[in-house]
């Protein structure tokens, strides 16, 4: 059973956002006291964390499907939904995150580094949050958006100071076991090592790590013999140690020809931008297996040629431990120089952002030909998110969506694109929301006499105070008294009489008139 996995595909599903709530507060003597629908909670993200204690991706090889929790729905009385718990996935330091198409998203090269691999959905707003001075009682709420669902590829690139490279069965694993406390698998057949082995070497006051890279053969840079998978682990090493087998019995092989083939493969391997090419890094040569008499003679024969090329050459034996101390100190010097150079040229902190399309406009309109005429497709982050948040069973919510799209300029864009009333409009790629477009000017929107969501039943009620009632009462009494006084003055002046003919003083006006005649 495999115990080391350096490549795995994760199937991620981030949590969805909770839906907003539609609710109206009820109080004593005031059954419609305003909106109080809470917002939905955001879903949980899926975050990758670079953990130095993790050395393999085996856990994700066995369980590649990972999902986080959804956000809770909003409730009445301004109660917001619960937040979905963030799911943290520890990965080894040196893990490269790629999308399904092979594009690099993040390089987890620093311990503790965090990367949001799957972004959660947003919670929808409740009708309390949608209420404004013009829309006092919204009868709708926004739905929560869906979280990211897709695949990401994790590739582990071992982080070590020194990489041991060479042909299979050259003694690389034996060298790691001899100079460190690592216990790799060692056998007398090629490709015993199928995954990198790390060992920590302590020399005087120096401490560094060495990586036993599986054996390389001719054509490794083209993928022959799993070469691409092995060479990937050499990218992050600051120095190279060529382990050459001086006791090989294979025909046509010798330390010099083995070195030339390995150098050719290292030169052909492309490194990421910003990294030093493999052959420009410090290199040492170890002539191994000199405990065999014929191997010692061959090492003495090829040493002058290798030194003439500018290499420092060490004769070693992992069996008798000859030359290992000198080699360990030499590697420590290379690592120390590399660390000093890196400290003199500090790299700016790498900020990892999830790649998103950046458009000059908030949306674009594309005209696609169809069997029933042109289809106008609206593509943009905001319009597509607004469509996800709309409950199309609620006419008021659909009207709110139309208002938002018109305010964003979608209607003007459709006019410019040549759309007319009745044209098919699609929002989003693929099987998006399709509807027959009806311009606002020709729809019933202009017949609405009040803003969407206005409800006179929940308007604030203004009650008169006792002082206002007293002032109103006294004003009415004063008006009545003045009216009586006016009637008395008119009666005394003879401008009017009662029904029985009696004037204001009680005399019969007709009799008085006859007597005067």
Swiss-Prot record:
The job of this chain, per UniProt, is described as:
An essential GTPase which binds GTP, GDP and possibly (p)ppGpp with moderate affinity, with high nucleotide exchange rates and a fairly low GTP hydrolysis rate. Plays a role in control of the cell cycle, stress response, ribosome biogenesis and in those bacteria that undergo differentiation, in morphogenesis control.
Outline the extent of the Obg domain: 2-159
OBG-type G domain location, by residue? 160-336
Top-level EC class, please? hydrolase
Q: Which gene encodes it?
A: obg
Molecular function GO terms recorded: GTP binding; GTPase activity; magnesium ion binding
Q: What cofactor is this protein dependent on?
A: Mg(2+)
Q: What is this protein called?
A: GTPase Obg
Among CDD domains, the record links this protein to: Obg (cd01898)
OCT domain location is 355-439
Tell me which InterPro entries the record gives.
G_OBG, GTP-bd, GTP-bd_Obg/CgtA, GTP-bd_prot_GTP1/OBG_C_sf, GTP1-OBG_CS, GTP1_OBG_dom, GTP1_OBG_dom_sf, OBG_GTPase
Q: Where does GTP bind?
A: 166-173, 191-195, 212-215, 288-291, 317-319
């Amino acid at each position: 059973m495999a115990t080391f996995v350096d490549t795995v595909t994760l199937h991620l599903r981030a949590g969805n956002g909770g839906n907003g709530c539609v609710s109206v507060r009820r109080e004593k003597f005031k059954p419609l006291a305003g909106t109080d629908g809470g917002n939905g909670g955001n879903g949980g993200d899926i975050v990758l964390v670079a953990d130095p204690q993790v050395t393999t991706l085996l856990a994700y090889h066995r369980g590649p499907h990972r999902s986080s929790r959804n956000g809770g729905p909003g409730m009445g009385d301004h109660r917001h939904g619960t937040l979905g718990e963030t799911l943290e996935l520890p990965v080894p330091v040196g893990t490269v995150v790629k999308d399904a198409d092979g594009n690099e998203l993040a390089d987890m090269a620093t311990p503790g580094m965090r990367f949001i691999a799957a972004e959660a959905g947003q919670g929808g707003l409740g009708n309390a949050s949608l209420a404004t001075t013009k829309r006092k009682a919204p009868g709708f709420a926004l739905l929560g958006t869906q979280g990211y669902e897709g695949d990401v590829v994790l590739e582990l690139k071992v982080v070590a100071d020194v990489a041991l490279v060479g042909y299979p069965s050259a003694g690389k694993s034996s060298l790691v076991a001899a100079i460190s406390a690592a216990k790799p698998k060692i056998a007398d057949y090629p490709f015993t090592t199928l995954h990198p082995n790390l060992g920590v070497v302590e020399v005087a006051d120096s401490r560094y790590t060495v990586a036993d890279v599986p054996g390389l053969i001719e054509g490794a840079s083209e993928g022959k013999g799993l070469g691409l998978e092995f060479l990937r682990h050499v990218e992050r090493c600051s120095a190279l140690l060529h382990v050459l087998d001086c006791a090989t019995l294979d025909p046509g092989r010798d330390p010099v020809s083995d070195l030339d083939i390995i150098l050719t493969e290292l030169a052909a391997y492309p490194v990421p931008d910003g990294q030093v090419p493999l052959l420009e890094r410090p290199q040492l040569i170890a002539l191994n297996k000199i405990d065999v008499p014929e191997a010692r003679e061959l090492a003495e024969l090829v040493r002058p040629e290798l030194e003439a090329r500018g290499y420092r050459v060490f004769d070693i034996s992992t069996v008798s431990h000859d030359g290992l101390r000198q080699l360990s100190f030499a590697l420590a010097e290379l690592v120390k120089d590399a660390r000093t150079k890196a400290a003199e040229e500090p790299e700016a902190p790498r900020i990892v952002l999830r790649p998103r399309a950046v458009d000059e406009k908030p949306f674009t309109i594309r005209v696609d030909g169809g069997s029933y005429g042109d289809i106008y497709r609206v593509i943009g982050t905001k319009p597509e998110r607004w469509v996800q948040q709309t409950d199309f069973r609620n006419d008021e919510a659909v009207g709110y969506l139309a208002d938002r799209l018109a305010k964003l300029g979608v209607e003007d864009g459709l006019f410019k694109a040549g759309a007319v009333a009745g044209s098919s409009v699609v929002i989003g790629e693929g099987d998006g929301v399709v509807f027959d477009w009806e311009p606002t000017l020709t729809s019933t929107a202009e017949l609405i006499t009040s803003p969407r969501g206005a409800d006179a039943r929940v308007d604030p009620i203004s009650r008169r105070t006792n002082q206002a009632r007293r002032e109103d009462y006294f004003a009415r009494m004063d008006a009545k008294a003045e009216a009586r006084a006016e009637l008395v003055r008119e009666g005394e002046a003879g401008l009017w009489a009662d029904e029985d003919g009696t004037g204001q003083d009680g005399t019969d006006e007709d009799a008085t008139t006859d007597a005067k005649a």
